[in-house]
Amino acid sequence: MKILLLGCNGQVGWELQRSLAPLGDVIACDFDSVTDRRADFAKPAAVGELIDRIQPQVIVNAAAHTAVDKAESEIDLSRTINAVTPGVIADRARALGALVVHYSTDYVFDGSGDQARDELAVTGPLSVYGKTKLEGEERIRASGCRHLIFRTSWVYAARGHNFIKTMLRLAQERERMTVINDQFGAPTGAALLADVTALAIQASRPLTGIYHLAAAGETTWYAYAEYVLAKAKQIKP
C-alpha cells in the first residue's frame, strides 16, 4: 500500500509516521520537505501535482492552519490551507480511487450547550478557523472521493505547539496566569489519533464518513492547566 502523508512534521503527522509505517510505503511530506516532496498547502495546485506524481492509494492529510486567533487576520491563507487545498486533494483522490483521511475540529460547532455533540449535530462555526475547517469537510464530501474525516479536540503531543507546552512556558515566565474555566473539552493525544487512523485504514469493513474522535472524559482549560502544573511540580530535576 502506498500512503501519502501530508503535514508529517506536525503533532499528529509526526505520530502518523510511526503508526502508518507497518501498513506499507509511507511517503511523508510537509511544506519544508525537499523539493520533490514539498507539500505547501498555500499552493493548492502544487499539492495536486504532488499527488499526481506519487499516485498514492491512501492520502492522510494532517496539515492545517491551526492558529485559531491568527486565522482571524489571515483569512485568505487559512481558507486556502484548511479548505481549498483539501478540496484539491479530494478531487485528485477521486480520480485515483484513493482514500482520503482528514482531520477536523470541534470548532465547527458554536460551542453552546453543555452536552457532547454527535456526528449528526448541526454545525455553526463562529471563528474563521472553524468556518474554514468546515468548508474543508464540505469540499471533501462534495468531491465524491472515499473519505474518513475525524473531528477531534485539544490535541497534545511531545512534539509541536500545544496548550501543555504553553502553560509550562508561561509558568516559568509569570508570577500569575489567567485561564478560562467555562469552556469544556477533551484533551486528546496525537498518538491516539495516529493509532486509530492506522486501524481505520486496515478495517476489514471499509469505513467512510465523519467520525468524532477524542479521548474520553472532559475538563476545562483551567482544570487542565492546574493538572499540568501539578504534574510538573512532581518531576524532580
Which residues fall in each region the model found?
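NAD(P)H-binding glycine-rich loop region in Rossmannoid oxidoreductase-like domains
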Residues: 41-81
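SDR active-site strand-loop-helix element
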Residues: 6, 29, 62-63, 100-105, ...
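N-terminal Rossmann NAD(P)H-binding glycine-rich loop of SDR-like oxidoreductase domains
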Residues: 3-23
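Hydrophobic "lid"/C-terminal helical patch
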Residues: 16, 51, 167, 197-201, ...
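Mid/C-terminal beta-alpha module of Rossmann-like enzyme folds, strongest
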Residues: 196, 203-237
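Rossmann-fold cofactor-recognition segment
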Residues: 30-45
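Catalytic helix-loop patch of NAD(P)-dependent Rossmann-fold dehydrogenases
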Residues: 73, 80, 84-88, 95, ...
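NAD(P)-dependent short-chain dehydrogenase/reductase
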Residues: 138-185, 191-199
